[in-house]
Amino acid sequence: MSEQVMVSVIMTTYNHERYIAHAIESVLRQQTDFRIEIVIGEDCSTDRTRAIAEDYAQQYPEAIRIVTSEENVGWRKNYRRTIAAARGKYIALLD
């Protein structure tokens, strides 16, 4: 897809194994006439959050990107780096 991303949906996560799939699916089901991307800031969860997010990113590489690091950076830095990775004209936060 070469058209510009209009909306970047920012999701920051830490140990959200129970909720992450539902949150991602809620964005993927949106019907729009513009391009949406999901940018997930995964902050070294100790559960399966990262694995679930990576599975979705593999299934939808044109729509989902994951921002990670080798160590937990905390919620504030996680938000900043995830927003910085956004390509959209507009940003939506999904907590």
Model features per residue range: what roles?
Residues 6-8, 37:
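Cell-envelope/extracellular polymer assembly enzymes that use nucleotide-activated donors
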Residues 16-29:
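Short, well-formed alpha-helical segments that are part of the catalytic scaffolds
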Residues 27, 43-44, 73:
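Conserved short acidic donor-positioning loop in nucleotide-sugar-dependent glycosyltransferases
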Residues 42-51:
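A conserved acidic beta->alpha catalytic loop
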Residues 43, 94-95:
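Active-site acidic Asp-centered loop
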Residues 69-86:
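Glycine-rich, basic loop-to-helix element that forms the pyrophosphate-binding segment
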Residues 91:
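Short aromatic/hydrophobic "clamp" motif used to bind/position activated sugar donors
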